[in-house]
A protein has these predicted regions:
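Class II aminoacyl-tRNA synthetase catalytic cores and aaRS-like
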Residues: 1-507
Length: 507
């Protein structure tokens, strides 16, 4: 049966359409049933009126439960008050499947329960919106590179070497030989760039990090371009252009989804401004509060954040008490109960987030004030830095000891590596890591020894410096961290359909 898509309803205003989908939510009043339908392309309210449908079809509409599947026909009416901006006034309805006891109800559910039912949680309005935004980012990423002459290539997932050390590798057996799941396709990307000029890979990456932070997954998707005849500055220019382009695509195509997840768009719109670029040494001074940014000290900003969080905790606790008292009142209508339950759930989630911030902020303040130059940034250090800027921050020229063996050393001052990390604002931290690649064969060999990596496993990589070596650069972007920032999500687990992370491999 050919039907229309909810996402196309704007084309059908004033006309009759046929739709198929599922009941996301329902409510009823005297002789009226309001069904929020989803079909994957969008959401809309369908109105079943007894006087129009007749008793038999009206009773069928009234019997529909959450996640039941149904077919309907009706007239499209523009209504900006409704979800998606349209309403369908039904002239026909037919049940396709009657769902019973759908486990994810409007009441509050804990994170573990929702993750155990991830296969069903994906149907929720919020998760639908996040996945739609993820899709836009993926398509925009491919479009950006394809439009600029890059060739999409594929790096192997099984490898016999470690790109950035062995401590976080998943080991496996490859026909009797030890092998690892890839941490990065970058080394292979360099080889492909020497053949094609400009390439990018887009594939799964695996890190065996026993970390349960809001930023870590064990399986995630990486975008890794590599460019021949490209230095650090050109690489940084491309990164800035790239992030501006893909975020702008979401702002253009996903306004409804951003509204559904209540993501303020003003911070995202600031990607049109030039990104902040600061060397590592200056970033350290900012983190320690020794250098002001627009008259502000990082430590003072964190102290203000802590005071604001504590006020928010008190206000949210008061709201929770008031909501609980209202729910305890007799005689509430079903719609009122649902509204208060939804608001109570949202308030408790805000409280959990605020209480976590209250625990973290004093530690971040102590860590920032005592940060030692020469160390890599931790997640809290990145958060501190991003609190002072409204655009992404590009930190470049890092101590070579904290960067990967393949990062190019500065010929004029070998203490520094020509690397760059891009930190997303609003406390999200690193989303891009990249830099210029080492072309000095002797320095590269020394680095492989220094990192205690098996030289024989990298002979093929060293061949890239023996035959036609040229300046080249690249970067890696973790898709899920990008999605988390764009959607302003508190945890990276919501950025991928079925997250794999420490302690969870199902469903």
């Amino acid at each position: 049966m050919k039907t229309q898509a909810i996402g196309d309803l704007a084309r059908w205003v004033g006309q009759s359409v046929e739709l198929q989908g599922w009941v996301m939510a329902r409510r009823s009043s005297k002789d009226l049933v309001f069904l929020v339908m989803r079909d994957g392309s969008g959401l809309c309210q369908c109105v079943a009126d007894r006087s129009t449908l007749g008793d038999a079809m009206y009773d069928e509409a009234e019997a529909l439960t959450q996640e039941s599947a149904f077919y309907c026909r009706g007239e499209v009416v523009a209504d900006p008050r409704q979800i998606g901006g349209h309403e369908v006034r039904l002239s026909e309805i037919r049940t396709l499947h009657l769902s019973k006891d759908f486990p994810i109800t409007p009441k509050e559910h804990g994170v573990d329960f929702l993750m155990d039912h991830r296969h069903l949680w994906l149907r929720s309005k919020r998760q639908w919106a996040i996945m739609r935004i993820r899709n836009t980012l993926i398509m925009a990423i491919h479009g950006f590179f394809q439009d600029r002459g890059f060739v999409q290539m594929d790096a192997p997932i099984f490898t016999d070497n470690a790109c950035e050390g062995t401590s976080t590798l998943f080991a496996t057996d490859f026909y009797g030989h030890p092998a690892y799941l890839s941490q990065s396709g970058q080394l292979y990307g360099e080889a492909m760039a020497m053949a094609m000029g400009k390439i990018y890979t887009f594939g799964p990456t695996f890190r065996a990090e026993k970390s349960k932070t809001r930023r870590h997954l064990s399986e995630f998707w990486m975008i890794e371009p590599e460019m021949a005849f490209c230095d650090l500055k050109q690489n940084m220019d491309l990164i800035e252009e790239f992030l501006r382009d893909v975020v702008s695509a979401v702002l253009e195509r996903n306004r409804l989804e951003l509204e559904l997840i209540e993501r303020p768009i003003e911070p995202l719109q600031k990607v049109t401004q030039p990104f902040v670029r600061i060397p590592y040494e200056e970033a350290v001074q900012i983190i320690r509060g020794e250098r002001l940014v627009n008259g502000q000290s990082a430590l003072d900003v964190l102290r203000d954040d802590l005071a604001q969080v504590r006020r928010s905790i008190e206000e949210t606790r008061t709201e929770i008490s008031e909501r609980e008292a209202k729910l305890a009142q007799p005689g509430l209508k079903k719609g009122e109960i649902g509204h208060h339950q939804a608001q109570l759930q949202a308030a408790r989630q805000r409280l959990d987030t605020a209480e976590e911030q209250e625990r973290n902020l004093p530690q971040w303040i102590a860590s920032a004030s005592s940060f030692e130059a020469g160390n890599d940034f931790g997640g809290s250090d990145e958060t501190v830095l991003t609190r002072l800027f409204e655009t992404p921050i590009m930190v470049y020229n890092w101590p070579h000891e904290v960067k990967a063996f393949y990062m190019k050393r500065d010929e004029n001052d070998p203490r520094w590596a020509k690397g760059v990390d891009v930190l997303a604002p609003e406390g999200y931290g690193e989303i891009v890591g990249g830099g210029e690649r080492e072309t000095n064969l002797e320095w590269l060999v020394d680095k492989i020894h220094e990192h205690q990596l098996p030289m024989e496993a990298f002979e093929w990589y060293l061949d890239l410096r023996r035959y036609g070596s040229v300046p080249h650069s690249g970067f890696g972007l973790g898709l899920e961290r990008l999605v988390a920032w764009v959607c302003k999500l508190p945890h990276v687990r919501e950025t991928i359909p079925f997250p794999r992370m420490y302690g969870r491999i199902a469903p």
